[in-house]
Amino acid sequence: MAATTAADAFPSTVSSDSDSDDLLLPNLLPSTTAAPAPSSPSREQLHHFQIPSLPSPITVRALPSRGLSFQLWPSASTLLRVLPATPCLLPRPPAPGSPLSVLELGSGTGAAGLALAAALPARAVLSDLPDALPNLRHNVELNEHLLASAGGAASVVPLRWGDASAMADVAVAQTASPFDLVVAADVVYYEELVDPLIETLRFFVKGKVAFVMAHMRRWKRTDKKFFGRARKLFDVEVVHEDPPLEGWRHGPVVYRFTAKKQHGKK
């Protein structure tokens, strides 16, 4: 989940929404280790994701006490499981010596982006706000040998949604290998970030570039605003739905966004 322009705390200003009970979600993950002690609120957590095509698991460090950007969320697990197993969602098949070029928005811990880099394989650019980058770089280092052995790679860049200069810098750095795919997990949560996120998608998701997003419903108003704006610019399809998580009314849903064709253009 991305770092935000506001403090990493759950917003009281939107608590009047009638469907707000899914904001705090359990980290329902296959394998987790934590240190130093279970009672410590500041402990780091190591999460491990075993992907069938890889010889060893992807490992990421989460730091829950640091805020939303440092936690692991259910949609990331869904995205890293579904996308490698569903080749039809990819804009092109990876080829030997020609991995996909992938941008992850709001990377948080980088779990999804790192897993995709190894499993597709891909050259993944993981992006978030500056405070999240040290932990992202740490997680890239944890997995760099696994990624390299699979033919993938990952790098980390700062990217504030809607910042034209920052977006241009990311695009220019990829001139030799333009992005094929943009991905994200659990990035629709604060209403004030909807417009910057839409502007970021408008910038990167063009032509044959697709955006694949795993999303967990939390706030009716925020979802309505995001999908209403998105459908004016993109064709949006549901490509996968997980069953509801235990104790919750919804499970993660995977969407695929492609740019609407302009009239008169093929």
Language-model regions, residue ranges each:
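S-adenosylmethionine-dependent methyltransferases
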Residues: 1-266
